[in-house]
Regions:
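Non-catalytic C-terminal accessory modules of carbohydrate-active enzymes
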Residues: 85-215
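Extended glycan-interaction surfaces of carbohydrate-active proteins
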Residues: 2-73, 97-114, 185-187
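Repeat-unit-sized solenoid/scaffold elements
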Residues: 1-13, 166-172, 177
Length: 215
C-alpha cells in the first residue's frame, strides 16, 4: 500500500516534494497530511513544509486547497497529528498552541468547527474527537496493537519538563501515562490503580510497547 501511494500520489507540487490529490492535480490540498498520520514519512519534510506554508496555512488553520478561502478544522487537526507522528514535535506543538488559542479561547466560537464558510462553523463532535486525538495519538503517540496492548511514542516538547495523561479508559482498563524529562532521556511510567505496570528510561522519540496482564 505504501509503495502504491508513493507511485500514484507522490509528486512535486511547486517547490514541495509531497502528494497530489489526484492525477493531473496541480494545486496543493490540505489532505496531503494523511500519509503522515499513517506513519508514512517518505515525503514528510516536503509535506510539512507545504502544510505550514502560506499557500495552505492561514490564521484560522489549513485551507482546503491553495487559493481557496475555505478552511477546515478537520484537515488542520489531522495535519497536527501527522506532524507529531513524523517527529516534528516543536513545529506541531507551536501550531497546536496557536490553534488552541485561536479556536478555543480567542475571538471565535469556542470549539473545533467543521469548516468556514462551508458548514457555517457548525460544531461536529468528530472535530472535537480529532482535537483529542492530536494529544493521544500525536503528542503521546498511542497506537493500539491488540485488545490489551499498545505501542506509544511520547513526544515531549523541548521546553516541557513533564506531561501526563490520566484516567485513560481503554483496553477495558483505566490507567495513567507519565513522561518526565531526565536530562537527555525520558522516564516513562504507566500506572493502573496506582500500581506501576511499565517503567522505562528511554531516549526521546523511542517507540515503547505495553501489554496488560489478564484481569
Amino acid at each position: 500500500m505504501q509503495q502504491a501511494i508513493e507511485e500514484y500520489f507522490g509528486a512535486r507540487m511547486g517547490e514541495f516534494d509531497t502528494y497530489r490529490y489526484y492525477r493531473g492535480n496541480d494545486l496543493l490540498r490540505s489532505w496531503i497530511c494523511i500519509p503522515l498520520t499513517m506513519g508514512i514519512t517518505d515525503r514528510a519534510e516536503g509535506t510539512l513544509e507545504a502544510l505550514f506554508s502560506p499557500r495552505l496555512w492561514t490564521e484560522n488553520g489549513l485551507l482546503t486547497q491553495e487559493g481557496s478561502t475555505t478552511f477546515w478544522d478537520r484537515s488542520t487537526l489531522y495535519a497536527l497529528r501527522g506532524a507529531y507522528a513524523a517527529g516534528a514535535t516543536e513545529k506541531a506543538t507551536a501550531y497546536l498552541q496557536y490553534y488552541s488559542r485561536q479556536r478555543l479561547v480567542g475571538e471565535h466560537v469556542p470549539y473545533a468547527i467543521e469548516a468556514w464558510p462551508e458548514g457555517s462553523q457548525r460544531h461536529l463532535s468528530a472535530e472535537s474527537g480529532l482535537y483529542s486525538r492530536v494529544i493521544t495519538e500525536g503528542l503521546f503517540g498511542i497506537r493500539p496493537t491488540g485488545l490489551a496492548s499498545f505501542v506509544f511514542t511520547p513526544r515531549l516538547p523541548a521546553d516541557w519538563e513533564n506531561m501526563a495523561l490520566r484516567n485513560i479508559r481503554a483496553f477495558g482498563r483505566t490507567f495513567d501515562i507519565e513522561v518526565i524529562r531526565k536530562q537527555a532521556k525520558l522516564r516513562v511510567v504507566v500506572k493502573e490503580k496506582d500500581k506501576i505496570i511499565f517503567s522505562k528510561t528511554t531516549p526521546a522519540d523511542c517507540p515503547l510497547s505495553v501489554k496488560f496482564s489478564s484481569h
